[in-house]
Amino acid sequence: MDNLVLLRHGNSLWNQENLFTGWVDVRLSELGEKEAKTAGQLLREANRYPDVLFTSLLTRSIQTAHIALMEIDRVWLPTFRSWRLNERHYGSLQGKNKAQVLEEFGEEQFNSWRRGYDTPPPPLHSQADDPRYEEPPPLSESLKDVQNRLLPYWQGVILPHLVAGKVVLVVAHGNSLRALVKHLECISDTDVCQLNIPTGIPLVYSIDPSGCATHPGRYLP
């Protein structure tokens, strides 16, 4: 039986404006709220009722989880939040329009920053203090960096709940979920460039006690 549900947050205000978002804490758009509600409905129709919830520390992830769980009467779920599930930090690209970055730097560099595995964008020069984080946030991250900070959390915190027989819901971001799916499906560093996780559609797996996926992920319905 499928025991892991991955859900990318719904469309955000900056997704709507085609801006690089990263760790900037923006809210869901009206479309994103509808996507989150639909995600909850899909969980109900598929009879996928999670026992525990994991989210990032970013509002769009938390909003999506709350709206989806309202649809299945599970807002009371035990909940764990971690910066390790945050979106990839896009460095100095954060807040910039993707089309303008593409025009300025060209398709090859743009795709390397956006979809490549081990190429971080240009870093920020400094980072404002944020009470959510005990240590200073990164100034930029590649997808490899995201995977390196996510996998210890997966193995040490999330996986034990699956081994204990729980159904786990992880509501996170395009790149943190790409990093996890890369691990679960053993996707190569090259092929992961083609992997995209759509907003607001539950992606389900069956995870065995060793932490391996027994089948490729499938989207509901």
From Swiss-Prot:
One of its GO terms (molecular function) is phosphoglycerate mutase activity. It is an enzyme of class 5 (isomerase). InterPro entries: His_Pase_superF_clade-1, His_PPase_superfam, Phosphogly_mut1. The active site is at 9 (tele-phosphohistidine intermediate), 87 (proton donor/acceptor). Substrate binds at residues 8-15, 21-22, 60, 87-90, 98, 114-115, 174-175. Keywords: Gluconeogenesis, Glycolysis, Isomerase. It comes from Tropheryma whipplei (strain Twist) (Whipple's bacillus). The keyword Nucleus does not apply. Its EC number is 5.4.2.11. Gene3D superfamilies: Phosphoglycerate mutase-like. Catalyzes the interconversion of 2-phosphoglycerate and 3-phosphoglycerate. Residues 114-140 are annotated as: Disordered. Belongs to the phosphoglycerate mutase family. BPG-dependent PGAM subfamily. The record marks 173 as: Transition state stabilizer. Pathway: Carbohydrate degradation; glycolysis; pyruvate from D-glyceraldehyde 3-phosphate: step 3/5. It comes from the Bacteria. This is 2,3-bisphosphoglycerate-dependent phosphoglycerate mutase.
